[in-house]
Amino acid sequence: MGTLARLAPGFLEKLSESHHMSATEKEESFMYMLGHNCIHVMNSPAAGKLYGQGLFEVENKRPIFRYEHLFFTVLDAYRPAKSHWTLKAPVYALFFPLIFDEYPDVRLVLTHRNPLVTLPSVCRLMESWCIAFDKDGSFDKHRFAKLQRIAAEKIIMVPFQFRKGNPDKEGQIFDCLYAELFSDPITIVKKIYEKFHIRYTGEFEQRMKVYLEDNKQGKYGRHKYSLEEYGFDVQSLYQEFKEYMDHYGYGIPDKMVRPVALGSEKALG
């Protein structure tokens, strides 16, 4: 962290507005250890179409899933999990079919949010990573956003199409809508545990309440972003994601408004 702060002054502070990192956030340690922190998309728009095609191809990622499974098998043999292993990474969605091939008994929480809201947010997050390592003024937001648009389409539609063709897997999948999670996170966690028959305790719930109280949204600042900033046309995006958006009841938002949190009187802008 100290080295990065010296090499790119202001980078960590800006990134923390959208994705807080600290020595206590264990998932960040795992992401770095596994080389998983989206390094492959940093400046890949400059790598050409062939790189992009290979990046999102499903079948050639099978060895990666096999290696990961072996890694956790060895880790579990040394230090067995008390209940289960929890893996969190949005890029799993890009290669959704391989999850079930490698982990047949997987219990999967699939999160959903309006893609017209998430796309510029993801662009801003990834821009926060990239821009510190480019020459001043050389970062092309529109060019960079084209790759993020392809990634977003894959992340959304690969699981969506897989589920249409594999209804037998529905018992292993829990759909978590962002608005419901944001408005009442503890209830959603209870539903997840109930669906997958995982033990839920009062002590666990109390720890969640303490965490939520200490980590309210906006604690580390807020990012501002828009579709237009990254060269996106809202109507074009809506048509591209229409099947998915209609299925989950999403429309074109009037403005970027967050849903109302439990205990709040109004939405957060």
Regions found by a protein language model. Give the residues of each.
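PAPS-dependent sulfation machinery
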Residues: 1-85
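Short charge-dense sequence patches
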Residues: 12-23, 69-72, 102-113, 136-144, ...
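Short, solvent-exposed loop/turn segments at secondary-structure junctions
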Residues: 39, 91-94, 114-118, 124-125, ...
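PAPS-dependent sulfotransferases, especially Golgi type II membrane carbohydrate sulfotransferases
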Residues: 49-65, 76-79, 122-269
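Short, well-structured alpha-helical interface segments that form or flank functional binding sites
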Residues: 63, 91-94, 106, 113-117, ...
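Flexible, glycine/threonine-enriched loop-and-boundary segments that flank and lead into catalytic domains
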Residues: 71, 77, 81-105
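Conserved phosphate-donor/acceptor-positioning beta-strand/loop module used by diverse small-molecule
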Residues: 88-89, 99-124
